[in-house]
Amino acid sequence: MSSKSSTQHTFGVHSEVGQLRKVMVCAPGRAHQRLTPSNCDALLFDDVLWVDNARRDHFDFMTKMRDRGVEVVEMHNLLAQTVAIPEARKWILDNQVVPNQVGLELLDEIRSYLEGLPDRELAETLIGGLSTHEFPETHGGEMLELIRDAAGVAEYLLPPLPNTLYTRDTTCWIYGGVTLNPLYWPARHEETILATAIYKFHPDFVGKVNVWWGEPTTDWGLATLEGGDVMPIGKGNVLIGMSERTSRQAISQLAATLFEKGAAQRVIVAAMPKLRAAMHLDTVFTFADRDCVLIYPDIVNEIEAFSYRPGEKPGSLELHKDRGSFVETVRDALGLKEMRVVETGGNAYVRERTQWDSGANLVCLSPGVVLAYDRNTYTNTLLRKAGVEVITITGAELGRGRGGGHCMTCPIIRDAVDY
């Protein structure tokens, strides 16, 4: 789809399965070349990537979406176009090059160096990181040598951000607006600043973005929110997983804001166990069609559902436990007589492996058409038997941070579905 076509539609995501029209992704790159066996845990990856293959597979992922009429925009490109705007470049550096991030010793020198970089190189550096050994001695002088000697080869003046691969989490579009999310792990905090800069300054977005909640320069304390837990499913309902990475404090604030602004009528909270293999709601539960969901039963069947609704007083909330199972709660919220459920398949061993390989992490391109990792053959076969068209992508490298197609996409424009 051309850029001209997508601009005929207002930014907003009105379902999980309607026609996907515009999406933001972030290709593997320099940040993933930084991953080593000694730092990958701290950077939230379970292993290092074969980066060349990851790039190839991600390009195929983007191509398959474009072949189905989706406009795909890539974060490195958007950021390079954003930092070409002097005001945007200054805003990013004002918020990235700060003592808490880079230290005091070389603060002015790092700022001066970054200000002088070409647009594309600055974008690559903001996402890919800047090590002490890459920083020019002409800028750092004797202080740089001392920092190198003291901190060693693993020290970064700007940290790499490999989790930008999973664009779902940093911001999430909920009906007609977006949230700028305070992420759980420190390794990801800077991602939201970069995404915010794109929405705030890029010509495609400036003046067109309605921010519901969140501000990346604010300390949110225990209020953390990640987009993998957030699903605007339609009919004024929003699903939010209370998970390893999304907290009750954030959910209640977001619910109150959505109600106050008339953006939603009900927020259904999925109370989940706090597990690495089920870090977000979308790792165990995704839609495959308007009336069909794929679930990892070992987790989803244990989810307790609660619902926030507007209280009687302005700004107040009512919270009630929902009757029935989580899937039944979702079915009833959408007014469906029946919700078809496909469970990730096989015996206990196959199910656990499938879950580790993001087998339940589908992204719908349109009703009944999904992208899924090729390696989860058993589950993909079950989806096809249920009438779902499954387009496969290679997940051997892309999934090493525990995310699939849903995690790797930030929908910006998606149609509603009639229920």
Swiss-Prot record:
- Database matches in Gene3D superfamilies: Arginine deiminase, L-arginine/glycine Amidinotransferase, Chain A
What InterPro entries does the record point to? Arg_deiminase
Biological processes per GO annotation: arginine catabolic process to ornithine; arginine deiminase pathway
Where is the protein found, in the record's own terms? Answer: Cytoplasm
Any GO MF annotation of the entry: arginine deiminase activity
GO annotations of cellular component type:
cytoplasm
Q: Which UniProt keywords apply?
A: Arginine metabolism, Cytoplasm, Hydrolase, Plasmid
Which domain of life does the protein's organism represent?
A: Bacteria
Query: Which reactions appear under catalytic activity for this entry?
Result: L-arginine + H2O = L-citrulline + NH4(+)
Which pathway does the UniProt entry assign to this protein? Answer: Amino-acid degradation; L-arginine degradation via ADI pathway; carbamoyl phosphate from L-arginine: step 1/2
Q: Where is the active site?
A: 407
EC number of the protein: 3.5.3.6
Family of this protein? Belongs to the arginine deiminase family.
HAMAP family in UniProt:
Arg_deiminase
This chain belongs to the protein called Arginine deiminase 2
Organism annotation: Rhizobium meliloti (strain 1021) (Ensifer meliloti)
Provide the taxonomic classification: Bacteria, Pseudomonadati, Pseudomonadota, Alphaproteobacteria, Hyphomicrobiales
